[in-house]
């Protein structure tokens, strides 16, 4: 298995229409685009990839295509589902396909669950997987409503330390990410924030798994290269953060799928309901603002 590290795209999932199937034929070209953009790996079926809007069967087939066309990219599979049985089935399938790690969000429908129950959920998952499985937990409480607390982390390390591989922190809180990096050197900690890539690299993170790299891979890779090659890290991060500021007022997958129409040669791809595409006016405004940033004319 490859070692996930560096800049990893929270890759998009293509659909033929808002109620249609996955556009599997679109995926190989997209993976080439991400690799050509200098990325080290991909996270499939995550938040940006609309994974929770897909069936288990669709997700498995998507992973089959990705693994067949991954090239040198590492692959992390988002396998968290509301039902533990689905999470186990999808995780087993992903591991059988040879993914380098799985990323699992906590069960998100039952509100205010006890930490003991969440820990038991993750332990049951690990018990159902091979001993050498690499399990990453997904901390994105603003979406799931369920934080990955230190009690959960400590408990899973105590019981399944050989399988517990890492954590993606998408809280956007650098102090929280730094605490994880400093407190758990045995875990690979990834930031999920485009704005925190430079800080994460300087602070000892394994890398960054971010949304913008799914449509702007070269901008994200530029931060990595500047950090490792003695370049202007602040300038590279500022440019990426400025693009993030454009996307923030808009729902992320619609903005990124729109952006792909001018950052790549890929055909336009659809979103799955309940997500809606941007209007023509919104797309034009987004592109114009992006071009001003790239030209260095944005105040």
Curated annotation (Swiss-Prot):
GO molecular function annotation: 4-hydroxy-tetrahydrodipicolinate synthase activity
Gene3D superfamilies per the UniProt record, alphabetical: Aldolase class I (3.20.20.70)
Location in or out of the cell: Cytoplasm
Top-rank EC class of the record's enzyme: lyase
Known EC number: 4.-.-.-
A GO-annotated cellular component: cytoplasm
InterPro entries to which the protein is assigned, alphabetical: Aldolase_TIM, DapA-like, Schiff_base-form_aldolases_CS
Coiled coil in keyword set: no
Active-site feature positions: 47, 109, 138, 168
Keywords per UniProt: Cytoplasm, Lyase, Schiff base
CDD domains xrefs: DHDPS-like
Regions annotated as coiled coil: none
Subunit organization: Homotetramer.
Family according to the record: Belongs to the DapA family.
Name assigned to this protein: Uncharacterized DapA-like lyase Caur_1967
């Amino acid at each position: 298995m490859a070692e996930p590290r560096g800049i990893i795209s929270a890759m998009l999932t293509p659909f033929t229409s808002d109620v249609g199937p996955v556009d599997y034929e679109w995926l190989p070209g997209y993976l080439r685009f991400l690799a050509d953009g200098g990325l080290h790996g991909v996270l499939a079926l995550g938040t940006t990839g609309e994974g929770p809007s897909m069936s288990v069967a669709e997700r498995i087939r998507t992973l089959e295509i990705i693994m067949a066309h991954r090239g040198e990219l590492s692959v992390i599979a988002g396998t968290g589902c509301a039902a533990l049985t689905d999470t186990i089935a999808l995780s087993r399938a992903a591991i059988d396909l040879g993914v380098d790690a799985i990323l699992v969000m906590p069960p998100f429908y039952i509100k205010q669950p006890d930490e003991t129950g969440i820990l038991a959920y993750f332990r049951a998952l690990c018990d159902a997987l091979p001993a050498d499985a690499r399990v990453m937990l997904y901390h994105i409480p603003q979406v799931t409503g369920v934080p990955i607390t230190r009690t959960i982390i400590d408990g899973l390390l105590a019981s399944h330390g050989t399988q517990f591989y890492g954590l993606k922190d998408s809280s956007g809180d650098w102090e929280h990410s730094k605490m994880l990096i400093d407190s758990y050197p045995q875990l690979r900690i990834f930031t999920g924030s485009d704005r925190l890539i430079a800080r994460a690299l300087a602070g000892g993170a394994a890398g960054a798994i971010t949304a913008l790299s799914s449509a702007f891979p070269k901008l994200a890779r530029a931060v990595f290269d500047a950090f490792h090659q003695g370049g202007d890290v602040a300038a590279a991060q500022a440019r990426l953060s400025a693009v993030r500021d454009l996307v923030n007022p808009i729902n992320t997958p619609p903005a990124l799928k729109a952006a792909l129409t001018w950052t790549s040669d890929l055909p336009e791809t659809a979103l799955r309901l309940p997500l809606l595409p941007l209007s023509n006016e919104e797309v034009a405004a987004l592109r114009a603002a992006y071009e001003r940033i790239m030209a260095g004319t944005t105040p």
